[in-house]
Amino acid sequence: MTQSLPLLNGTEAYKLVTTQGLYDKTVKFYEKYLQLVHDKRVGTLTNSLITLKLVVDNSFKPLDVVNDKDWRAIVSSALVFSCTNIQHFRDLAAGETIQAYPNETNPIEIYLKDPNGYIIGITETKNAISIKPTLPKQSVEASLISSRSSRIDIASSGVSTDSSYPAIPKTAKAQKSIAVMTSGGDAPGMNANVRAIVRTAIFKGCNAFVVMEGYEGLVKGGPNYIKQVYWETVRNWSCEGGTNIGTARCKEFREREGRLLGALHLIEAGVDALIVCGGDGSLTGADLFRSEWPSLIRELLDQGRINKVQFDRYQHLNICGTVGSIDNDMSTTDATIGAYSALDRICQAIDYIEATANSHSRAFVVEVMGRNCGWLALLAGISTSADYILIPEKPASSREWQDQMCDIISKHRSRGKRTTIVIVAEGAISADLTPISSKDVHKVLVDRLGLDCRITTLGHVQRGGTAVAYDRILATLQGVEAVNAVLESTPDTPSPLIAINENKITRKPLVESVQLTKSVAEAIHSKDFKKAMQLRDSEFVEHLDNFMAINSADHIEPKLPEHTHMKIAIVNVGAPAGGMNSAVYSMATYCMSQGHKPYAIYNGWTGLTRHESVRSLNWKDLLGWQSRGGSEIGTNRHTPEEADIGLIAYYFQKYGFDGIIIVGGFEAFVSLHQLERARENYTAFRIPMVLIPATLSNNVPGTEYSLGSDTALNSLMQYCDIIKQSAASTRGRVFVVDVQGGNSGYLATHAAVAVGAQVSYVPEEGISLEQLTQDIENLTESFSEAEGRGKFGQLILKSTNASKVLTPEVLAEVITQEAEGHFDAKCAIPGHVQQGGLPSPIDRTRGTRFAIRAVGFIESQHKVLAAEANLDDDDFDFDTPKIIATASVLGVKGSDIVFSSIRQLYDFETELNKRTPKTIHWQSTRTIADHLVGRKKL
């Protein structure tokens, strides 16, 4: 590499401030990367064209420039040098954190940090604004690659990938070839996982391959089964169900000879890393493959099927697993790819069945999948408030389960319930391991209770259709993390499994996770059901306890002694959100099972102050609430101070409330703050108070997840899928979709990941004219490349508050004008459709979980305040940590459910003017959303 030009701005001398401790490192840096010669006498670094003067100042602090943002946007200036061979510089900088533009594979500019934090750039262009390299990097023929995607054959020709994709910091030390395969049973979301893996691998400067038809493709090998794929190959895959690269069971791979063939075919294709998306069986096979790899390639060498060069090149195979299974039966992860999509199908079917069951006062036995795992049956039971569930983890004797089921159903019927829903997992067993079939349950319901009963077996409907938003996003984030994992792996690193715990993507040891999963089945078969439950994650056990509590309600003796019984109220504040009714239903039924008396405040705070709209809740009135959308008890945006906080205190005292649960968005957050601050003046507020965040905006401080945001995300996703279909059918059309969310871009960002939107504009970033110009250029490039390749449409998602001037209508007109006839743009306004209809299973089950946690919080904090109840105002210390903690926000943070005091959140963690948290927890998701669609950020 040679520097053929001085600094681009014409400067030939420049001063750099450093410290004595960093002086030597700085010298070595510029000697290595810029080939400058150090003159110790005068402290300069020079060549024939430029001079850098090093100035030592020990008070100087090195610049702290973060790696996950575009350095060009952060620093005020950068030194940029011109060279004739940027590829040589890229190789020289292998192992350093760099940023390359427009992409790492064929960069025109490369930036890296010197030891002092200064940004140094290298470019092949002749001036600062040129986008053409000084010399051509390759012939035209070399840039033509396959691109057309198809379910049957992925290969085609004629499209260049030399497009300008955004760059992300380089992590790989050397280029790898990464293959992805799907194996075992198919699951919705697998295509999104493959798409993310392929595009992230290409970003990282790696070759991307797919293995067709699972392990069968490995065994058969050749270009028909192990195919190199490219950026545009996986276009729109996230919106499609099943797996486009096929999956199959393969007996041959279970034998060593089959694995030997698999190793040979991977080496022939040049693959040195494999990511497997499948269940525990598929992942077990993958890890066995890795452990045998050294002996397999040695055997291939001895047989003469590979040469010594290949043997030395492919010494190690890096393996990573992502879990694709609708059963959600993998230990160490809260959710597997496809599980929530299957749950959505089940809940939708039961919601439909409920209507016909109510008409005829019938009983329905619904059989769902789950051979060794009752997760689907359990969460479907909670989501639809089923009367009884049968799962393999908690069997009873043949007589016991019949008695228990008949007892609870007869109690429900005697109290006026017209419908009966019993959910049976396909692996349901009694304590002696005798299978329990749907027909067995049907017979008991008919013979013992005399019910008009029907059986519905959902079967493969549960696997079908496109993935829900959660699965698309989970699969995408896990795909990105899987590529990072294989690039960071060493021969000594255990094979990782990409998992999720609450809201956090994590890596777990693959072997241990699979072994734990198998241990559950072994424990069940050995009748050690207690161990089987212990091996399930804590969330599963919590869900089961919750189901039993809300299902029994007040039909049995309360769990708590009478002197501990309390009056607990619940109120909805803010805009309606999916899951609000689930929270009210679960809070009320759980209170009944504990012995507490639940109250509902109807129509928010103004309902209380204007009409004294307070009612105690009884079980029969709540029937069906778990699966209803909106807010059955009514809601509005008024805060206590707007409604009359003194009158609210009066009614609290009149009814003797011992605790209050507020369900809602930012208005509910402000309400909790006002009530907590009013404790000094009103003794009625010296009770435990807790907020359950519920808003589609997901903008409540103290939590990364709010009820209603998943329902809204699914509604918006379905709308966008339909709009995108229209855009693709019309050819050459962009739709600008207006997205709600206030000043939070959460909804727009996550919807962009789920539907593969080309651009998303959010309030946190706004819309600059420069970025809009760049985005229009990207769209023009996309449409020009797509010409002649079938249907192709694009989406732009714009948060309403991203710009008040550039409305969707204006944006569409500007884009159409700038497109100059190559394509056009239309606007689409989904409006309040985004609030959703029926709540999603995630919002239903989390609403239940949060509500029961909230009641538990009130039970524990009531003791703290009871000890201070008799103190005078002067003696009551409002500022002690234990008193402050009695008014809290329930939230999900990372992998934990936490309670954070409202005072801490309101005073230190909230942007009050913007109505958002100060910390944006989903910023990294934005980066991924942009780089997976090739968007350049300025």
UniProtKB/Swiss-Prot annotation:
Superkingdom of origin: Eukaryota
Catalysis performed (reactions): beta-D-fructose 6-phosphate + ATP = beta-D-fructose 1,6-bisphosphate + ADP + H(+)
Amino acids binding beta-D-fructose 6-phosphate 1: 362, 454
Active site annotation, chain numbering: 327
Pathway linked to the protein: Carbohydrate degradation; glycolysis; D-glyceraldehyde 3-phosphate and glycerone phosphate from D-glucose: step 3/4
Keyword GTP-binding: no
Binding, ATP: 185, 249-250, 279-282
Sites where the protein binds beta-D-fructose 6-phosphate 2: 325-327, 369-371, 426, 460-463
One GO CC term, this protein: 6-phosphofructokinase complex
Localisation: Cytoplasm
Enzyme Commission designation: 2.7.1.11
Record keywords, A-Z: Allosteric enzyme, ATP-binding, Cytoplasm, Glycolysis, Kinase, Magnesium, Metal-binding, Nucleotide-binding, Transferase
SUPFAM superfamilies with a match to the protein in the record: Phosphofructokinase (SSF53784)
Requisite cofactors: Mg(2+)
Region called C-terminal regulatory PFK domain 2, residue ranges: 567-938
TM stretches of this protein: none
N-terminal catalytic PFK domain 1: annotated span: 1-552
UniProt binding sites for beta-D-fructose 2,6-bisphosphate 2: 637, 695-699, 740-742, 832-835, 915
Similarity field: Belongs to the phosphofructokinase type A (PFKA) family. ATP-dependent PFK group I subfamily. Eukaryotic two domain clade 'E' sub-subfamily.
Assembly and binders: Heterooctamer of 4 alpha and 4 beta chains.
Function description: Catalyzes the phosphorylation of D-fructose 6-phosphate to fructose 1,6-bisphosphate by ATP, the first committing step of glycolysis.
Protein name as catalogued: ATP-dependent 6-phosphofructokinase subunit beta
Species assigned in the record: Kluyveromyces lactis (strain ATCC 8585 / CBS 2359 / DSM 70799 / NBRC 1267 / NRRL Y-1140 / WM37) (Yeast)
